């Protein structure tokens, strides 16, 4: 019976990904952004559960999943649009923006490493966790290049984003950060795409700064992690 589901076609993996994503998006909006209903998180859990319950292999899913994965990198390029829209702000505060994001990203990388060695994780797990500061399209090839497990990296990136999506705006308000540039950079640096979504709810400037942060963090991760990995591992 399972064979009749078309599991050997790309449509299977695409539908297994998109159906829970669309449903979760509907309820996520209905519940005013309840973090456990974050579409990325729900579709990931639902996909794993479906494959586990049906006994369908990951290889069957991957046929269609790879097609979705192909569009991750072109989608990331879209973050250049807010960069262009806010180019005057970027020119005016470029040192503060680049400096703040660079410091935040390096601290995040070191904290990830300290947590990993505290819990005595193996080198492969540490390599999988180090790139999680970047968005998925950037983190996965970096993880693969330093000997990490891409699936584990993807999980780390998504969980990190879900937490920031749920708590990021509240933390910004808790610390009374009123500057829209600072708020956007904080959310984008810590939560990548979902951080930008949280920043969007605060304002247009926050959204643009969050998008800028995603791009810059990605560049830093690509440049720094491959250099740090041989030293730390």
Swiss-Prot record:
Cellular component per GO, a single term: plasma membrane
The keyword Cell inner membrane is annotated on this UniProt entry: no
Subcellular localization: Cell membrane
Any one of the GO BP annotations: programmed cell death
TM spans (from-to): 5-25, 33-53, 63-83, 97-117, 152-172, 212-232
Pfam (any one): LrgB
Membrane topology reported for the UniProt record: Multi-pass membrane protein
InterPro entries hit by this protein: Antiholin-like_LrgB, CidB/LrgB
Superkingdom field: Bacteria
Keywords carried by this UniProt record: Cell membrane, Cytolysis, Membrane, Transmembrane, Transmembrane helix
Known function: Inhibits the expression or activity of extracellular murein hydrolases by interacting, possibly with LrgA, with the holin-like proteins CidA and/or CidB. The LrgAB and CidAB proteins may affect the proton motive force of the membrane. May be involved in programmed cell death (PCD), possibly triggering PCD in response to antibiotics and environmental stresses.
Family of the protein in this entry: Belongs to the CidB/LrgB family. LrgB subfamily.
Protein name: Antiholin-like protein LrgB
Gene: lrgB
């Amino acid at each position: 019976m399972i064979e009749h589901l078309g599991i050997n076609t790309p449509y299977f993996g695409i539908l297994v990904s998109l159906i829970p994503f669309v449903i979760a998006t509907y309820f996520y909006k209905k519940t005013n952004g309840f973090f456990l209903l974050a579409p990325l998180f729900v579709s990931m859990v639902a996909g794993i559960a479906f494959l586990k319950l049906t006994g369908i292999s990951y290889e069957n899913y991957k046929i269609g999943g790879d097609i979705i994965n192909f569009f991750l990198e072109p989608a990331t390029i879209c973050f250049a649009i807010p960069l262009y829209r806010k180019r005057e702000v970027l020119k005016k505060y470029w040192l503060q923006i680049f400096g703040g994001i660079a410091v935040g990203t390096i601290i995040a990388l070191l904290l990830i490493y300290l947590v990993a060695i505290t819990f005595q994780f193996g080198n492969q797990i540490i390599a999988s966790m180090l790139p999680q500061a970047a968005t998925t399209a950037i983190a996965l090839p970096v993880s693969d290049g330093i000997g990490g497990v891409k699936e584990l990296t993807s999980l780390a990136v998504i969980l990190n984003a879900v937490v920031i999506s749920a708590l990021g705006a509240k933390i910004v308000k808790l610390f009374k950060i009123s500057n829209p540039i600072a708020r956007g950079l904080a959310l984008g640096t810590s939560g990548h795409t979902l951080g930008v979504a949280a920043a969007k709810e605060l304002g247009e400037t926050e959204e643009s700064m969050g998008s800028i942060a995603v791009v810059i963090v990605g560049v830093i991760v690509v440049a720094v992690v491959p250099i740090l990995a041989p030293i730390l591992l």
